[in-house]
């Protein structure tokens, strides 16, 4: 079999990162090995995100740069997958004549055949939905991982249809993977040296809700925690309305379940939440936060916020700031609203100026920056157990993550990668911590 090189760029969420890892596993079966150099590749793939307009345009600009490589390599194949591919379909081939293949979010299992067809000079687009659990059986597990932590997809799709969000339209309805397949993959990862798994889904805590044959998400976490070798569990992304009492109890009962939770609020205003179609009120969200802190006092929250949603008043924006002050997120992904064609919110009057949206975003981010540093300051001098994951950016340093998700850099030998070490935090920064090894 001839060996070719494949270069993948991944945009967007952890689900896309996991999909890209699986794509590399699949392509190995037809002789492709990964490279970090686009100019070296026979095959270049972009795994794309369309959640926000900025991400979508970034993909188009990147494609325009990459097709230039075809001037020097007539054999080069360029493909686009992910949510932009699902949304645009064959229109991508029409917009970019030098593009060779387009594959949607349900069609990864067809990619090898599409690549082989492209090698023969055929241009292909496949974005048809598979509307049942067959789509989760068609995608192979990752093989040969050398990572210490790994993503594990447990469900796909979303049926919340928040008014601003394109995801249900490009990812399709919710489908839960069989728990036996999930546990088999987790055991394989543990046997390969993985010590931390992150369970993934567009709305991960709705796992099993549509199937009486599968455990609930809380029960699934308990099953994963029982796998020998797995010492840490995280999950992304959860919806506040599906944060059940049973799932909250897991944070008090399972030491392996990390003390970091991504719990997107999107707004602190009941009026805005209703227009967004989020399915909960401000107080219901805060009740979940208080319940989680009651069972896990050291828990920290990350989240998402949208400012400038249609109709948002200054008073409603202030309610978002006050929610942030009460929750005290350790990190926050924040964005100015941009309408997505095909969503319900796109039909609302986008009545805030770009300048006002930007002003609110800057005020929100300034508050978050202060809060992050205040939380980090409290960690100064504390003892933290860190899973060492990689070499650091500075010579002689290695890097890992604490239970709370903070990146910690420290001086140490690379032989520590893959182990848990105890560190004392000696310096804090906005996005990372500096530690020193404790004897033990």
Curated annotation (Swiss-Prot):
Primary residence: cytoplasm
Keyword Oxidoreductase belongs to the record: no
Boundaries of every TRAM domain copy: 377-439
The enzyme's E.C. designation: 2.8.4.3
Assembly information from the UniProt record: Monomer.
Family label: Belongs to the methylthiotransferase family. MiaB subfamily.
Annotated function: Catalyzes the methylthiolation of N6-(dimethylallyl)adenosine (i(6)A), leading to the formation of 2-methylthio-N6-(dimethylallyl)adenosine (ms(2)i(6)A) at position 37 in tRNAs that read codons beginning with uridine.
NCBIfam families reported for this sequence: miaB-methiolase, MiaB/RimO family radical SAM methylthiotransferase
UniProt protein name: tRNA-2-methylthio-N(6)-dimethylallyladenosine synthase
UniProt lineage: Bacteria, Pseudomonadati, Thermodesulfobacteriota, Desulfuromonadia, Desulfuromonadales
Gene this chain is encoded by: miaB
